[in-house]
Amino acid sequence: MKRILLFVLTNLAVVLVLGVVASLLGVNHYLTGNGLNLGALLGFALVMGFGGAFISLLISKPMAKWSAGVRVIDGSGSPDERWIVETVRKLASQAGIGMPEVGIFDGAPNAFATGAFKNSALVAVSTGLLQGMTREEVEAVIGHEVAHIANGDMVTMTLIQGVMNTFVVFLSRVIGYAVDSALRKNNDSQTGPGMGYYVTTIVLDIALGFVAAIIVAWFSRQREFRADAGAARLMGRRQPMIAALARLGGMQPAQLPKSMAALGIAGGIGQWFSTHPPLEARIAALQNAHQD
């Protein structure tokens, strides 16, 4: 729940900041000055919605490094670090993507992949994961993250978030205009948006943002099943990924920052807002999958 909340709040912050800038530039007055211009509003919503989502994507890797305290490694350190880098290199080559940056961060068992582009992503694992799993299980977890990159999940989730943002921005302003018109129906002398418009759009931007987060979380859960299957393919068998998930079931997962939401290995909390399916469901999906 904390991870998806951070995701929602950060995304909303970007969209709201863009909204404030647009208001200062007089965009709202242009949209509503002579009646609601739906065509212009749709264009504005698309720019706002996808702009906010892609800004979040572009800053995801540096934000992830900062928020999780990731230490980037190149394989020149300890034997364990060399093994991690070589494992990422091998799996990335098998998946047909460029070599990601590799990092380690302190904390409870977890891992994540992030970044705007397939060939310049970041894969990071926690010290708790390295200490609590066998190498085969860690390799399966890394395979899961590499599969996220190969599947284009960062861009896919950004596009979905962009669509949801567009819906939020468009609908909140349509309702805001209707509320504002109803409140000042006897005051035809006023032009441009009034207080009712601004208050309504701000409240609905936040409220509808949480509704959109439920939809985004559902899509994220489907991507997790695909990444699990991708890890099994990269490993050549399902058992290492099943074993890693089973072991995670007995561990206390770390909380990932927003920039890794929907991409970490640990399970989420909450039926609607969870970005990850229950570990039991993921294990069952792997066990029931047909292997070539």
Curated annotation (Swiss-Prot):
Locations listed in the record: Cell inner membrane
Origin: domain of life: Bacteria
One function term, GO molecular function aspect: metalloendopeptidase activity
UniProt xrefs under InterPro entries: HtpX_protease, Pept_M48_protease_HtpX, Peptidase_M48
Cofactor: record remark: Binds 1 zinc ion per subunit.
One Pfam family recorded for the sequence: Peptidase_M48
One GO BP: proteolysis
Keyword tags: Cell inner membrane, Cell membrane, Hydrolase, Membrane, Metal-binding, Metalloprotease, Protease, Transmembrane, Transmembrane helix, Zinc
Active site per database record: E145
EC number in record: 3.4.24.-
Cofactors, names only: Zn(2+)
A GO cellular-component term linked to this record: plasma membrane
Amino-acid positions noted as binding Zn(2+) in the UniProt annotation, renumbered to this chain: H144, H148, E224
Enzyme class: hydrolase
Topological category with respect to the lipid bilayer: Multi-pass membrane protein
Chain ranges passing through the membrane: 4-24, 39-59, 159-179, 199-219
Similarity comment: family membership: Belongs to the peptidase M48B family.
PANTHER family: PROTEASE HTPX
Protein name: Protease HtpX homolog
